[in-house]
């Protein structure tokens, strides 16, 4: 093959030449727009999902021209960029010749709690009452606000106890952005002694003494798996560095909202726990993977991480906040790590486990948000804050996310040995006119239990004889006015939608 110097064209045969490479051509305007959005950010492969968010946020969709330009800018194949963009539900990929979606999207939650509260009727009313050319109305999986069902997301603005009237009023007022609640900021947290223990440990603490405290407390992973937290630290430390810490904030199990509840109120209790764990395993970087359904939390964390950097408590860039994109499977730790690396969120085969081969193939400590809240408390108050609490033969405390037919849904911090009877009582009892009939003990993955099983402690290891488990302690209470069959179909529909399709039984059946 030679170059025809007079034309600057690659020649590969008589009369054959090509001025541009084969395939979809690069649009100069789209390339310029992508370059402007990315600015001075490094064009690293692991930032691909962050860059897709920038384009989606700016233009409301991902056009073929922008995807082509992003591939060029990052020196990736178009296929790589396209497969990642189409994997995640929150990216609207628009092919050439297709009409982009309307500028405004209403996502109506279709989780079990919201369905019980009339979400289907709400969605139907909105589809009939809004102009589809200007507003798109779609159903969406749980957004972690089950205590205020039915709820929806208008742009990035959540409307609790939603009605068509509330939605129309919000559209008219232009309320489409997230609203941050009042929370304890860095100054308030430090005034009450926050970060003092972290600074003491950094000045001369023994990580093994802290690990012993965590073990004595009985703290286990509170994202659902329940692995002993202190033991996990030892596994990660046994592998040569550099090491990382990853926070699993992808609270996607329907009915679960405890992490959001705490992060919207006391973000620094979580952040200090994270930094203590990072100190213990000598983590080079902390990655926080937070679900896209929590825009207010993302804003709060971005603000407070910047405050930590300004105060000199962490160097710039030490905490890397990453934004999910609407994939339930990324709640699984290895799928989350794939997503942090800018890939599709497909779970890895194990072994090796992430404690040895995690982010960028380095040892990685993975913890849930609530677990790290308790790390901070145990290190500050001592292991007794957990192990001194006993009820029904169980030790410790649990944050139960309770929704459904109870008077006071919400996050209830109760002894880990609490039964469903205890939990309903903590919620003020059943709603008027409703008789307790069944419950979901730990999200849809745990199935349904009848009201007759009301005296079993809802904790780790207590529900396995019944063929279920506590998981993330997402409790949904049903009454005699609800159909167990309809509830089961709701759960099955969720898993049908959210299956990544990697495993054959999930994809085609057993």
Which functions belong to the PLM regions below?
Residues 1-64, 68-71, 78-79, 83, ...:
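Iron-sulfur (Fe-S) cluster-binding modules
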Residues 201-239, 388, 401, 413, ...:
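Accessory "access/gating" subregions that flank catalytic or transport cores
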Residues 413, 422-429, 454-506:
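Hydrophobic alpha-helical bundle architecture
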Residues 15, 189-196, 245-259, 354-359, ...:
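Gly-rich Lys/Arg/Thr-decorated short loops/hinges at beta-loop-alpha junctions or inter-strand turns
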Residues 48-143, 147, 209, 287-329, ...:
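Small-residue-enriched alpha-helical segments and adjacent helix-cap loops
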Residues 298-416, 428-431:
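Hydrophobic alpha-helical positions that pack around
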Residues 88, 266-280:
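Histidine-anchored nucleotide/phosphate-binding helix
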Residues 215-235, 326-338, 496-508:
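Conserved phosphate/anionic-ligand binding catalytic regions in large, soluble enzymes, centered on
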